[in-house]
């Protein structure tokens, strides 16, 4: 087994677990498979996590922290104005689906229906992560409106909730139908929701 510092071993377990969950789901990922894939002894797992559920919570918190960081960078310093950056967020997922025929890297899409009825702690971690995404979108909408690069009806937070729910639903439908059309249709609707202001 490779030698890891204490932090590295925990991080390695979480990263390995995330990849396995993206492939098999949370219940489909056995601890034996996780430990074998990560090349970590069983005792080490329980040194860092009191249970598989606690591992799941930590995995989701890690996932959303990284997701929020990437989204923050895109919305704050990506190319173009705030409208361009919000649309780029959605376009990236559509491009990925068109290139690979699947949506990878999103634990919300993969695990939401599976774990929300199984674990209140994991549901709470997922809800907190989703609310973080919505808050970032809300701030970008508010900034875009103040900079006169986009317009929309209602309050930023309310509209961000709609945009997130629309895109999450499109992701799920694309996964079910194995078609990019739900994402394409949703993106077209997003463009109408956050319109370019009339000159």
From Swiss-Prot:
Reported phenotype of the disruption mutant: Deletion mutant is more resistant to methylglyoxal than wild-type strain.
Processing and modification events after translation: Cys-21 and Cys-116 form reversible intermolecular disulfide bonds in the presence of reactive electrophilic species (RES). Formation of disulfide bonds leads to dimerization of NemR, which alters DNA binding affinity and NemR activity.
Domain HTH tetR-type, chain residue ranges per copy: 7-67
Pfam families given in the database record: TetR_C_13, TetR_N
Secreted is among the record's keywords: no
Activity regulation note: The redox state of the cysteines plays a crucial role in the regulation of NemR activity. Inactivated by reversible oxidation of cysteine residues in the presence of inducers such as quinones, glyoxals and reactive chlorine species. Also irreversibly inactivated by alkylation in the presence of N-ethylmaleimide (NEM) and other Cys modification reagents. Inactivation by inducers decreases DNA-binding affinity and leads to the derepression of the nemRA-gloA operon.
Induction info: Autoregulated. Up-regulated by hypochlorous acid (HOCl), the active component of household bleach.
PANTHER family given in the database record: HTH-TYPE TRANSCRIPTIONAL REPRESSOR NEMR, TRANSCRIPTIONAL REGULATORY PROTEIN
Protein name: HTH-type transcriptional repressor NemR
Species, as recorded: Escherichia coli (strain K12)
Lineage: Bacteria, Pseudomonadati, Pseudomonadota, Gammaproteobacteria, Enterobacterales
């Amino acid at each position: 087994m490779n030698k890891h510092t204490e932090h590295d071993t925990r991080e390695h377990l979480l990263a390995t677990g995330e990849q396995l969950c993206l492939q098999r789901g949370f219940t489909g990922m056995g601890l034996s498979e996780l430990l074998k894939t990560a090349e970590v002894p069983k005792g080490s797992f329980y040194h860092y996590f009191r249970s598989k559920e606690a591992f799941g919570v930590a995995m989701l918190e890690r996932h959303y922290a990284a997701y929020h960081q990437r989204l923050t960078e895109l919305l704050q310093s990506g190319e173009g104005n705030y409208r361009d950056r919000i649309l780029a967020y959605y376009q990236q997922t559509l491009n990925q689906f068109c290139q690979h025929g699947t949506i990878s890297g999103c634990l919300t899409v993969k695990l939401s229906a599976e774990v929300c009825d199984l674990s209140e702690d994991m549901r709470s971690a997922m809800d907190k992560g989703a609310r973080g995404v919505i808050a970032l979108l809300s701030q970008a909408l508010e900034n875009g409106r103040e900079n006169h690069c986009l317009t929309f009806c209602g309050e930023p937070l309310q509209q961000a909730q709609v945009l997130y729910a629309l895109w999450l639903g499109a992701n799920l439908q694309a996964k079910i139908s194995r078609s990019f059309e739900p994402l394409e249709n949703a993106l077209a609707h997003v463009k109408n929701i956050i319109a370019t202001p009339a000159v």
